[in-house]
Amino acid sequence: MRQAWLVLALAIGVACSRSASSLDIATTTSVVNSGLLEAILPQFSDYRVRVHAAGSGRSLVMLAEGSAELVISHAPAAEQQALAGHSDWRYQKLAFNRFVIVGPVSDPAAVATSPGAVEAFKRIAATGRDFVSRGDSSGTHERETMFWRLAGISPSNDHLLTSGASMAVTLRQSANKQAYTLSDQATWWQLEGELPDLRQLLWDDPALLNTYALLYPVENLKAAALAKWLTEGPGRALIGAYQIGGRKAYEVWPAGCPGSLPDATVCAGSR
């Protein structure tokens, strides 16, 4: 079998010719920033995997355009919309962790004592604190937008700062601005040692559940091979074993727990 190589094509405009031995996937930036894909994909030997880190929204567009053959996404609403227009796509939940609200160590908005994420967003707005938004149709931005909506708030442009970039860039910008932000837990763990002016403030609200899914055309056998490797083969164990600072970064989707639709949630007792 051929040795697989992981190519992180962070600049999406990179031109590359597709061959029978390569597989182009587009993905949320979080599984790149967290180090997960770099850790596990070199073990996949069927094809040479080329990874385009684009954010969930852009990744789904790439799949529809044919510039990606498989997507790893964590944006259920965008996934539902994409599936509605592509009956030939297969959908399968892959793993989960949590979103976390991160902010200044001093926590001037008292997010750490908030009963939940929606109340935390209300407190951030009420105290006039800066919030750094991804602003890029990513899965993290989708969840952030949902929290603002449920809070009944249209955040002021004076206090809503848009990074338009990856989760890693957004966290660094939050540290520089002493601002709050929403992050996936794994990327935060990967960077927290570099960002002593920030701390994790809220993570235990069920609304912060963060699910990852695979989407790919049914007829694409290369994509199907990688999907099977990730969900049923050695890749599944590698995801479950991946740690950051001795902490388990992802939980694999529980066996026997329905995961064929974007609104699927983790079975009781599995979180």
Predicted segment positions?
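Residue-level signal for tight coil/turn positions that link beta-strands
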Residues: 96-98, 128
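Bacterial N-terminal signal peptides
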Residues: 4-13
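Serine endopeptidase catalytic core focused on the charge-relay Asp
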Residues: 101
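Exported/periplasmic ABC-transporter solute-binding proteins
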Residues: 16-46, 57, 61-67, 75-76, ...
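Acidic, polar ligand-binding/catalytic clefts
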Residues: 70-96
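Hydrophobic anchor at the start of a short beta-strand
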Residues: 49
